[in-house]
Amino acid sequence: MYMYAIMDTINHPKERNMDKLYIVIPAYNEQDNIEQVINDWYPVIEKHNGNGQSHLIVIDDGSKDSTYEKLKQCTKTRPLLIPITKPNGGHGATVLYGYKYALKNGADYIFQTDSDGQTLPEEFEPFWKRRQKYDMVIGWRKDRQDGISRVFVTKTLKLVIRICFGVNLTDANTPYRLMKAETMARYIHLIPKDFNLSNVLLAVIYKKKGCSIKFLPVTFRPRQGGVNSINMKKICKIGKQAVIDRK
């Protein structure tokens, strides 16, 4: 048995828990949800702890409520949790801030989800198992439970991306994605720091650059609180910017 363990270490020098995972979660005015979100996702970072180097990064985007204070309270019993606060810049800018923080601190893999309770940590493992095969594994909200208007917005965004960028992406803006840090490091500079839909543009860039992308179906529950980060105005803006960039 001991010999098998040695051979397994030789054949697989970088074990599962040696990969440094950074989970990035933006939060804005989520005082009613944030503790539950931490309770949900902290076990994931504990399991994939990267020999103590993995972290759950929750970025308070200038909340006007007690979101950040509650985050700090949560750190007392959760050493892998790192709360960050910054001036309000919107979801896209906050996600980008988190990605850059993860890259700067040596992440091997970066996972992003939101703080509204719509996603399930129980569905993370299929993403993690595919981490080495794909540059990006994105959730596909096959059966959305957050209303027909949100389905319409997603379909409209998909059409805008196809028209403006000439690529087809199943669900470009899903806040449930696992990414190789080394791939992200090559392309993140192409995204403006104040861009509203950073995840969308990142997926488009990966597709245009020929990176490997895999979509997996995920559950997407009704929003537990807060305000949606994407709307028709923002979709029109990304389309307008794409037209300008192509001139």
Language-model segments: what does each one mean?
Residues 125-148:
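Conserved donor NDP-sugar-binding/catalytic core segment of glycosyltransferases
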Residues 107-116:
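Short beta-strand-to-loop acidic/aromatic patch adjacent to the donor-nucleotide binding site
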Residues 68-105:
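Conserved donor nucleotide-binding strand/loop of the catalytic core
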Residues 50-62, 85-87:
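Short beta-strand/loop segment that forms part of the nucleotide-sugar
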